[in-house]
Amino acid sequence: KMAKEDGTLTQYFETLDSTFSSCDIIFLCAPVSNNIEYLKELKGIISESCLLTDVGSVKEPIQSAIKELGMESNFIGGHPMVGSEKSGYAHANDHLLENAYYFLTPSERTLFQLTTKFSSFIQGLGALAVSLKPEEHDFITAAISHVPHIVAAELVHLVRRADRNNGMLKQLAAGGFKDITRIASSSPVMWEQICENNSSNIKTLLTSMIHDLQEVIDQLDKENGAYVNEYFKEAGDYRNSVPDHSIGLFDKVHKLYVHIPDQPGTIATVASLLAFNNISLKNIGIIYNREFEEGVLEIVLYDEESCQKGAQVLEERNYIVHIR
């Protein structure tokens, strides 16, 4: 309804009927189990040339359903590697897919012309099409998305359980802790289904992680500083080698950290400077826990261009600015 109201959609329907027989492409954007139910209804409706695709984070369950229903020639699994911890149409934007990887998982029976057509369509949206087998896709997303979400949620639970009645840990957990656990605020309904549908890969990786954490505990018991040093060094080296020129599964956060004096009106001055230069703010505030942060004032912006422009504007006024 929101998309219709703002003009993105020309029309929408609340039931599946023969109207969908004229569709060239149908995107299934509900949770995996719901999409599988929709497939059963669509089978007798869509035309032979219609392309069916989904945007789910797990591929093998829906690919299996497609095979059972005899719809392989019409289906290409899809997974845009974009998003944030916020869900729903209100948090979408018109450049969401630009320079983002878009996984495609066609079956052996998918019509070649449909694969070519859909790849061109995806590239036309500014995304980078990458073809994978369903099982490859599910392991990759378990490693770089599903397990990290579980770990982020567990870190939050760890602090929540350790917090006392006065809520001191919550009060002090701003800055770095809130950044690394941001994805723990994702939709519980969506993650319930993801974990159910990709449980095998998730359990394999979590078991490996538990083993590694136990090794850290063992080495701490031995007071093995060299091991701890190498542990962080290897992690840092690999993390620094990860490219950031394209969008990944986690929506990139564009931030400026600014050194400001503790004086009345300082935040308003900074905000006014940015507004005067047509730079929109997503959020702005003082960082009270700055153990791992640079700068007193944190400014969250909407995109990389705004971030660079904002830094330039403030630096020209002699503010010390750090870009993240």
Regions found by a protein language model. Name each.
Residues 1-8:
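NAD(P)-binding Rossmann-fold cofactor-contacting core
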Residues 16-51:
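Rossmann-like NAD(P)-binding element
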Residues 10-15, 130-132, 323:
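Short acidic-hydrophobic, aromatic-tinged amphipathic segments that line or gate anion-handling sites
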Residues 96-183:
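Internal alpha-helical scaffold of NAD(P)-dependent oxidoreductase catalytic cores
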Residues 238-324:
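A conserved regulatory-domain signal marking ACT and ACT-like small-molecule sensing domains
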Residues 40-90:
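Rossmann-like NAD(P)(H) cofactor-binding subdomain of soluble oxidoreductases
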